[in-house]
């Protein structure tokens, strides 16, 4: 019966972590639950992955708001609907000047829930409904909508667990508004009753309106989004060329063509190692992964960019032959199985370091070349000291007192009441997501549109960035490409250029010999 649940990924608003939300629902006898965080899908994949542990059917959606003003809730009927919601949300996240309208768009495979406002006019389409909160029931008896009960559903929002959580919610809202708690407007808070109720208690509230319960159940029954979290498959771009067989033939050719460059005096051991690696790479579905890395680095070489291939990929002779790495695994007796094997769950890993001067152009090349591409996010959480400072401001503590609290050099029993509250609630919000950042170098290149998996936002780098992190990406078979920035490579390049300028008679210095 819950169409509007928030996790703590409703940043500086919600207080419940996704798994905790499922545990609370299970305890209250809830069998189907909709996660609809505010203007984000950051928690959706984790929520779906964990839901089977609690025998709860997950429903995915988004609570669209301007600030705290709820406009409407969108629920996905299926994966196509989820993709449509993500694409629509991303339009707003990519352009901060856009405001979410009062009327929802016409999106395929999506249910729309509007919050009921007394005396407001609504013109509802077939897939649109009015959400009736418990406190709306008295007004509804005198509303014309009482005669249109087939379009009315239960809307009990869930943002926190209990009164303690509501206090945390108010503190988060004060932090978000950069104001003293005592001056936080009521309009910036949720309702203290926005908690999950036992199923029977919720049922009793709507006992006079059984149609609402029936309509709500019907919506939840018709929402069926599915993702495969089995790590045996990859959802990276499947092919670099036209077909998987064509890709394999290209990879095979590149590997054997590279023998003359890497091994002028080759022997049978080289070919035996190549055949073994190619067989495993093909079996594990990583042919296109190698080809995409090869294409990126072919471009880098064409531009004269220095780079270093690191990570467990240095164990691969195929990577060495494709000039992805410069480490000879035969000479150093490195085991390919440390990189890829049929029993290893972790994805393959190439860490490619570029000069800080060249990395931006490489990133641009990747986004220009590959269609379904995005940067990966990281969740920047409240660290204890940050929480202390933010809550210190909310409670009006002077900076000198906050400085003492952040050092930890104090006697808790000698602190005044406000300082003790700061310490108390800092331990509660420590670890809560505070804002989304950008992974140091992680890029995903997907077979399906990125919005199939989640919404994207646009950070200062101006490239679409996922709202899920690398761990969730791996859970759904999206393995990142690490394009990293190394200032030292830029300095080495500058040094070789200076040497070449001062000693033009000397042969050019190869960075690989340094």
For the regions a protein language model found, what residue spans apply to each?
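Alpha-helical scaffold/interaction cores of sigma-54-like transcription cofactors
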Residues: 1-514
């Amino acid at each position: 019966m819950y169409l509007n649940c928030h996790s703590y990924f409703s940043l500086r608003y919600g207080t419940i972590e996704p798994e905790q939300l499922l545990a609370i629902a299970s305890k209250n006898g809830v069998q189907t639950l909709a996660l609809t965080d505010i203007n984000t899908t950051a928690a959706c994949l984790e929520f779906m992955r964990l839901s089977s542990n609690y025998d709860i059917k997950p429903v995915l959606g988004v609570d669209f708001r301007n600030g705290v003003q709820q406009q409407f809730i969108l629920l996905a009927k299926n994966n196509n609907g989820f993709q449509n919601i993500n694409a629509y949300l991303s339009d707003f996240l990519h352009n901060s000047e856009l405001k979410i309208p009062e009327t929802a768009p016409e999106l395929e495979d999506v249910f729309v829930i509007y919050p009921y406002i007394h005396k407001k006019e609504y013109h509802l389409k077939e897939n649109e409904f009015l959400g009736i909160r418990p406190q709306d029931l008295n007004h509804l008896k005198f509303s014309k909508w009482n005669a249109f009960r087939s379009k009315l559903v239960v809307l009990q929002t869930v943002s926190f667990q209990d009164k303690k959580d509501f206090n945390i919610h108010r503190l988060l809202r004060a932090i978000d508004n950069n104001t003293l708690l005592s001056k936080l407007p009521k309009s910036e808070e949720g309702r203290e009753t926005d908690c999950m109720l036992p199923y029977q208690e919720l049922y009793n509230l709507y006992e006079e309106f059984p149609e609402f319960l029936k309509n709500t159940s019907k919506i939840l029954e018709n929402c069926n989004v599915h993702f495969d979290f089995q790590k045996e498959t990859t959802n990276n771009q499947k092919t670099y060329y036209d077909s998987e067989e064509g890709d394999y033939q290209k990879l095979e050719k590149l590997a054997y063509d590279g023998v003359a460059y890497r091994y002028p005096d080759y022997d049978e051991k080289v070919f035996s190692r190549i055949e073994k690696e190619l067989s495993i790479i093909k079996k594990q579905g990583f042919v296109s992964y190698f080809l995409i890395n090869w294409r990126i680095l072919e471009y880098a070489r064409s531009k004269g960019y220095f780079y270093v291939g690191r990570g467990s990929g240095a164990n691969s002779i195929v990577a060495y032959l494709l000039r992805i790495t410069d480490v000879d695994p035969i000479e150093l007796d490195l085991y390919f199985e440390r990189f890829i094997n049929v029993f290893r769950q972790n994805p393959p890993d190439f860490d490619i370091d570029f000069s800080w001067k060249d990395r931006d152009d490489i990133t641009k090349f990747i986004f220009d070349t590959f269609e379904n591409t995005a940067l990966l996010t990281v969740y920047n959480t409240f660290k204890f000291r940050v929480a202390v400072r933010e809550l210190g401001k909310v409670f009006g503590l002077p900076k000198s007192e906050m400085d003492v609290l952040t050092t930890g050099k104090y006697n808790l029993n000698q602190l005044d009441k406000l300082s003790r509250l700061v310490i108390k609630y800092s331990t509660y919000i420590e670890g809560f997501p505070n804002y989304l950042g950008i992974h140091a170098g992680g890029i995903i290149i997907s077979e399906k549109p990125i919005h199939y998996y989640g919404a994207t936002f646009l950070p200062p780098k101006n490239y679409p960035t996922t709202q899920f992190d690398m761990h969730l990406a791996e859970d759904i078979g999206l393995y990142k490409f690490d394009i990293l920035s190394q200032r030292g490579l830029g300095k080495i390049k500058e040094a070789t250029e200076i040497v070449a300028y001062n000693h033009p008679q000397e042969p050019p210095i190869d960075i690989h010999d340094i």
